[in-house]
Amino acid sequence: MSTPISYQLAFGTYEDALRMVGVPSEPRTAGTVVSAARIQMFAATVQDGNPSYWDPDFALQTWGGLVAPPGLLMGWLTPLPWEPSGRPPVSAIAIRVPLPGTTFINAANEAEFPLPIVEGDRLTVVEEVVSVSPEKQTKLGVGHFIETVDTFTRQDGAVVATNWNTLFRFTPAAS
């Protein structure tokens, strides 16, 4: 029997959440390698004709292979909904931070790519909670800002991307 992906939020106190700050996650490796099919499906979806995504000869000479679009970064580590091993999938670290609040919204995102991600790479990510704000009152509701950093490496250990993200986890204000 399969184990469904659980995107259920972890609940706890602000103090519980602070215990996660600065503690790197265990490395999590993608279930599949970066592939031309996914690169081109993404590029087709956004109608991007960049030859780095479509022309194998151009991409090989320029990048060492078809290059992954930056917008696809988080998709490489999205867990498969089922694996034959029965290993349960792991949700992103921000969902595992124990806090009050039933809703979250992305507030900011910034990524840096020191090296290209190319067809055939197998990515691994280490996630870390950088900070959790004290409780804030906003027009959306009362909650906490959670800042995370994800460091992506390829099979040789080289860092290919770093992604900084800020989520607001909150209880919606009454209408």
Model regions: which residues?
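HotDog/MaoC-like acyl-thioester-processing domains
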Residues: 1-20, 24, 108-175
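Hot-dog-fold acyl-thioester-processing enzymes
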Residues: 2-108, 174-175
